């Protein structure tokens, strides 16, 4: 199978696209939320909440799995889940159905930004990793701007379903890209302990006051962001 250099520009571009996956999934359909609410007779804001719940829970799973079996397989599985979830969203005929598929979609979308950071950690030292993360952050900043603009143009000609079909197409392109990137977490560096042992470490972190202080600060920041995103389509 064709592979690419793990430190070339193409590899960086793929990681940037994976990092932007979450921002695109949450922001691209914001202009369509009022139409979705009317069409499905429900609160479209719940689909954003459902996505965030799925995204948060999925991190606990994919992180432990990727330390055990490597980065590439979870990436492939996650992107496939994202594609299937996006198809489900596009075909949804009720708000509850759409909500369920959004949670499912989030389980796949989570792998992009999470494992991109892990792959950078695998390949780079502290200084280089900081530079790479800065580069990827630029793309993450562009996605929330470009997504709603693109969706707004789509809604001129099509219904809200087209936005999720666009995410399907993006997911397929991401899957092709993921298939050619190299594995960055070699066998000798993978965790030899059980996944259950990793979950025990989560409890250790939750009992660490320093960790929880930083976590609450970051959480408060994102609460404000998503509160704004939820209400912005109706302003």
Please give the residue ranges for each predicted region.
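Extracellular/periplasmic helix-loop-helix junction of adjacent transmembrane segments
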Residues: 32-58
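Extracytoplasmic
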Residues: 10-41, 62, 228-233
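Juxtamembrane intracellular "pre-TM" segments in multi-pass secondary transporters
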Residues: 2-4, 185-215
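Helix-breaking motifs and short loop linkers at transmembrane-helix boundaries and internal kinks
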Residues: 41, 70, 91-97, 108, ...
